[in-house]
């Protein structure tokens, strides 16, 4: 905004709206952007920042659609896990080596019309569970004629779109010692993204207890993706 004012030679009158967690409005702020910034950010923090300890385990419920598509898609599930695990400041929300459980309808289906390059990217990723293995094929994926045609003429995602998602999702695979997709259907896509399948939550919870020990400190987020996202201010010394 400083550059805008420098270019125009005028002060900018700015209006900022802060949503509440349900998608309504918590407040509106108007004036010069510097003058309203502190009050607007304080309001946003009051609405969306939660102070909490660090957790041994996190359980998250997924809706049918989130971000870029259907949660039947294993890459979309991995991105959802990463989004929650990265929503922190101070210290990581999930302790190193902790466990995450997604309650999801993931059955391995990848929409070939919307995400034509995802299945190939997932196959490349599965070999090492490292995004770099897919990046090595960047130019080939980017220039693949069928993928480009789908992107340019049929409303599909860009051929290299899954590379971006796998890159950022590397975080949860490195932070969590156990990632479980519970419910849905057993499918090879779950293992390909580095997760473990459980037929239901009871079986998933047994895996968590075996991994973390009895009475793990657990954060349960049944409707995280149905609300305006939260940020967790983590105090790792808090008990």
Regions found by a protein language model. Name each.
Residues 20, 63-66, 106-109, 185-187, ...:
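Short, glycine-/Ser/Thr-/acidic-enriched flexible segments
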Residues 23-35, 68-74, 151-154, 182-195:
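Acidic/glycine-enriched edge-of-secondary-structure segments
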Residues 56-61, 101, 219-220:
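Structural motif
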Residues 74, 80-81, 199-202:
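N-terminal glycine-/serine-/threonine-rich phosphate-binding loop
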Residues 167-239:
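Extended hydrophobic packing segments that form well-structured cores
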Residues 78-179:
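C-terminal catalytic subdomain
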Residues 1-56, 61-64, 81-94:
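Conserved, well-structured core segments that form the ligand-binding/active-site neighborhood
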Residues 27-28, 68-77, 110-122, 192-193, ...:
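Short glycine/threonine-rich loop-to-helix capping motif typified by GTGT followed
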